[in-house]
């Protein structure tokens, strides 16, 4: 195999990876994760692209201390971020599978 053929193969692979990654990013924007804190008193819905779509606070919680509400909101959002990160890793691994990329390369996208 000559160097020119190797370069063409690399360019073809790069274009395929870029297309797969773009499709995966669109897919992530449409997928949602759901998290909660305080046994469901605070619920968060977030996309795979870390966009918070909905925050629900149980009305009974509004009568309590603001510090507790803030802590539960932070806990629910942090849980949603962890789930969205896992969804991202899973989706990107699928988008780049079969490409022969070295381990850890998916994180570059």
Swiss-Prot record:
Q: Where in the cell is it found?
A: Cytoplasm, Nucleoid
Which keywords are on file for this protein? Cytoplasm, DNA-binding
An example Gene Ontology CC term for this record: bacterial nucleoid
Pfam families, A to Z? YbaB_DNA_bd (PF02575)
Q: Say yes or no: keyword Cytoplasm present.
A: yes
The record's annotation in Gene3D superfamilies points to: Nucleoid-associated protein YbaB-like domain (3.30.1310.10)
The GO terms this record gives for MF are: DNA binding
Q: Which cysteines share a disulfide bond?
A: none
InterPro entries from the entry? YbaB-like_sf, YbaB/EbfC
Where the protein is mainly located, per its record?
A: cytoplasm
What subunit structure does UniProt give?
Homodimer.
Q: What does this protein do?
A: Binds to DNA and alters its conformation. May be involved in regulation of gene expression, nucleoid organization and DNA protection.
Q: Name the protein family.
A: Belongs to the YbaB/EbfC family.
This chain belongs to the protein called Nucleoid-associated protein Pcryo_0799
Write down the species. Psychrobacter cryohalolentis (strain ATCC BAA-1226 / DSM 17306 / VKM B-2378 / K5)
């Amino acid at each position: 195999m000559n160097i020119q053929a190797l370069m063409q193969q690399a360019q073809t692979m790069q274009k395929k990876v870029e297309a797969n990654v773009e499709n995966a990013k669109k897919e992530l924007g449409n997928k949602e994760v759901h998290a909660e804190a305080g046994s469901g008193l605070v619920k968060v819905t977030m996309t795979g692209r870390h966009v918070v779509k909905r925050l629900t606070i149980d009305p009974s919680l509004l009568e309590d201390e603001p510090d507790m509400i803030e802590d539960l909101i932070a806990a629910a959002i942090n849980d949603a971020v962890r789930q969205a990160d896992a969804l991202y890793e899973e989706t990107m691994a699928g988008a780049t599978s079969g490409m022969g990329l070295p381990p850890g390369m998916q994180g570059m996208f």
